Amino acid sequence: MAELTNHFNKVNELLNDWDGVGLSHELSMTELITSILNSINHNSHSGMSNQKKQQIQAKVNQIKKTDLVVKRQQDIDTLCANKIQHNYNEIVAYRLRSISSLLDSKYYDAFRYLIEAINSFVKVFELWSQNILWRLSLDLRLMAELATLNVGSNDSNNSNNNVTIDYFEEASRTLLSKCFQAANADRTPNLAESKKNAALGVVNQLFQIYFKINNLKLCKNLIKTMESPGFPTLESYPLNQVITYRFFNGRLSVFNGQYKKAQEELLYAFNKCPNDSIKNKRLILLFLVPMQLEQCKFPKKSLLEKFKLTQFIDIVQSIKSGNIKQFNECLSTHQNFFISKGIYLILEKLKIIVYRNLFKKVHLITTGQRIPIGNFVSALKWMENDAIDIDETECILSNLIYNGYLKGYISHKVALVVSPTNPFPKLPLN
């Protein structure tokens, strides 16, 4: 009973002190859920310090010990009502029930109890407790991921095994209608005192779900709301939340073909991301590198090696040198990797830059403004395809001219006439 009593006393103490940060840690289920997720995914917290691993394991052990006591109680609701301050007793009770269900592999029940904990919390939510809102939002997303992984395998352990549920959809609905609305509905005129200061942490969890279920159109409405005059400026939110927000904003811009905006957002996220957050910086680079290559800005080999993105090394080299054959081979070799990260089509579009750099070399070794089309055909045959003909070559040249990578015009089947000044301009992003 001591473990549960200590938990109750700690919750009451933190409530009396209005310590939202401390209370969010005390009520956290993150360590337990991620521990189970990692065991399923065979992930051993690689890259995490031993001290951090020990802290996580200590938290998990504490939760398990407390749960053994909870399972011996006949009426946990009444016990919480008697031991916890009235406005938080339901939250604590539902959380304890969620943990018990989770440890019994009853993922549907665990998910439902966590939603009930959130429903109880938003009724008493105040700005000082925003860290709890963020923690509950994170735990709900992680719980949805865990429950989704176990659909069909452990559903028989649920209280209602006839239920079919889209956990991510249900989680996003709760986050939007309960958590985000709890922050958004505040009409306090002084934004510094408004619950809207808690909104960005919830929005970031929604972003992760929307990208997970490939429903990106829902992100636009959130961005429009967050950047409206009625909300605090982005700079007023915690930096780690701003980094996450701008990362997803950058990814959305990539998807929408807004490459200049994407580069700005992703570059901000990468530069502001702490240097010891190797995993996050690597994730940002996955999308930033293609945006930089679009502008012929080439990352150093040492940077790609540091973040274990060696798949890009030959891509960078082939674009620099205009080596179409090497570019195609690299795309083919690492196709599965690039597809799994959702960047294959973006990289494929860079082929036109490779053509540009190859044809620029042809121009440099040719005297005068009129370059025979045959010169380009020969270069392509040597680099890429013996079967390529003059019509295909003219098509490539036309695309280069149309997209602004080359200034000049084509004299059909005779020559390319290039501009006397800056025929291969520096690449602007769209």
From Swiss-Prot:
One Pfam family per UniProt: PCI
Ranges for the PCI domain? 243-424
Q: Which Gene Ontology terms of cellular component type are present?
A: transcription export complex 2
Q: Name one GO molecular function term.
A: double-stranded DNA binding
InterPro entries assigned: Csn12-like, PCI_dom, WH-like_DNA-bd_sf
Give one GO biological process term: poly(A)+ mRNA export from nucleus
Q: Which family does it belong to?
A: Belongs to the CSN12 family.
What name does UniProt use for this protein? PCI domain-containing protein 2 homolog
Give the source species.
Answer: Dictyostelium discoideum (Social amoeba)
